[in-house]
């Protein structure tokens, strides 16, 4: 995948405010669907749909803990996204 394709994919995933907020909430800690739903004030079904997109983009990891699945941000992927986005946004000159 070229840098341009990576940039487009990243910005497409981040084009929804709820997903941006989910990434912020999942940095440095893990939360289950119900905790995310309560915090974001959306339904668990909506959270699950957003998490599917974030998992497909390889930005979150699911960890089963007992009956619950907890999600967290993949720090190394977030660092890569930061690098790719910065390469687009940096000023030349």
Each predicted region: which residue ranges?
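N-terminal leader segment of winged-helix/HTH proteins
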Residues: 1-17, 59, 80-85, 92-93
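Residue-level detector of intrinsically disordered, flexible termini
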Residues: 43-45, 56, 84
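Short alpha-helical linear motifs
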Residues: 48-50, 89
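Alpha-helical residues within the helix-turn-helix
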Residues: 38, 49, 55-56
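N-terminal helix-turn-helix DNA-binding core of bacterial DNA-binding proteins
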Residues: 5-45, 65-77
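Residue cluster at the C-terminal edge of the helix-turn-helix DNA-binding motif
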Residues: 55-63
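Intrinsic structural disorder/low-complexity segments
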Residues: 10, 52-53, 73, 86
């Amino acid at each position: 995948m070229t840098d341009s394709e990576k940039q487009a994919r990243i910005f497409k995933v981040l084009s929804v405010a709820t997903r941006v907020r989910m990434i912020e909430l999942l940095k440095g800690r893990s939360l289950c669907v119900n905790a995310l739903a309560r915090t974001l004030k959306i339904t668990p079904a909506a959270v699950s749909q957003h998490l599917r997109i974030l998992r497909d983009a390889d930005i979150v990891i699911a960890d089963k803990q007992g009956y619950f699945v907890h999600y967290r941000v993949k720090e190394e992927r977030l660092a890569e996204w930061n690098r790719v986005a910065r390469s687009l946004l940096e000023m030349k000159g």
